[in-house]
Amino acid sequence: MEKKETRQSYGEELAILGEKNQNIVVLDADLSSATKTDIFAKKFHDRFFDIGIAEQDMVSTAAGFATCGKIPYVSTFAMFCAGRAYDQIRNSICYPKLNVKICATHAGVTVGEDGATHQMIEDLSLMRTIPNMTVISTCDDIQTKWAVNEISKIEGPVYLRLY
């Protein structure tokens, strides 16, 4: 069996979920080739939104989609999600308990070549303190496939941490 990056499994499973559920929309912050949401984008370009390097806007947009019955999957690096968009996650998604899936890639120190500005180890502690947030951290590609499917069954905010 070939071992894959967790984000590769995330992108593949997200595209499969997109076939099963037309209410799934995917938002990315100009990193779709890195987060692997480009797999979803190629199949469902009308349900994929590249917000650009504007993580706070992306999270707020996801909250808006959720209030209209869509199921947003927000994807970016853990640093930019938990770091830059913390207030929006806390106040716009978690307090009203909106059904938004936040999928943060490049967690920990796995992006060594990008330097300390792209590394995030405190995202787990930040996300775990927010009321109504479910936090899941996967260890490999197999567990990631399972987790992507399981979080789709959770009604409410989820933080999925990928390496």
What are the roles of these predicted feature ranges?
Residues 1-163:
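Thiamine diphosphate
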